């Protein structure tokens, strides 16, 4: 069995993290030539390329597997060192999460773990349809995803669902939907998406109003909190998690434009196996809190 030298693996990791050989060399305090030599040594060991030398570089499938292995080893090693050394550097946990979970339930779920454990979070925000890919590539050690199937050598548990409502302010509804929400009225009503890959509102409008993708005016805003602000100020109608706007709905500041119609996103927690003790604490916290505040039916 081929056993990689973790010093050479760290060179591969640095090139991916720093998005290039020059910055990787600066990060590792070695020359650019030394970085290239270490990666070539790894590639010779495994008999195949580990990097696609694009700008920025990206790992091959085998490179992704090695980076995932490095994440597991680093996590277990740092936890062990934490047991052996007092005052050691807090354990770094890199997690991939979707913006809506971050804006609603995830931080409260981790509050106790963060307050009484020596850890540092590195939260990487990504759409819930793509967070699992970050775990596959070895960029993170855990991911909140809509994918129900675990990756090889990983574990998965169901967290619960976020229900997304199609909402707007009363003023917006009066302006764009004086006769109710109809297909023709929707063609003129601006919506908002998180990025160009966010198709939630498109799927909702196509499923319920037979509107093809791209048929309504759409803003692009990379912020869950900004969705709420845009809806409150009457700029757009939005797909927003019910959990995020309970107060606004109860006060009447926002209204559900299509009562009884919603988009449900079931969320799952993925992480490497075996779990370290600290990751087990994170897992328990996310599952316990998720089962309390997310839809379970």
From Swiss-Prot:
Record-annotated DNA-binding residue ranges: 21-40
UniProt cross-references to CDD domains, sorted A to Z: PBP2_IciA_ArgP
GO MF, one example: DNA-binding transcription factor activity
Residue ranges of domain HTH lysR-type in the record: 4-60
Top-level taxon: Bacteria
Membrane-crossing residue ranges in chain numbering: none
Keyword line: DNA-binding, Transcription, Transcription regulation
Subunit structure: Homodimer.
NCBIfam families referenced in this protein's UniProt entry, alphabetically: argP, PRK03635.1, PRK13348.1
Annotated family: Belongs to the LysR transcriptional regulatory family.
Function: Controls the transcription of genes involved in arginine and lysine metabolism.
Protein name in UniProt: HTH-type transcriptional regulator ArgP
Species name: Klebsiella pneumoniae subsp. pneumoniae (strain ATCC 700721 / MGH 78578)
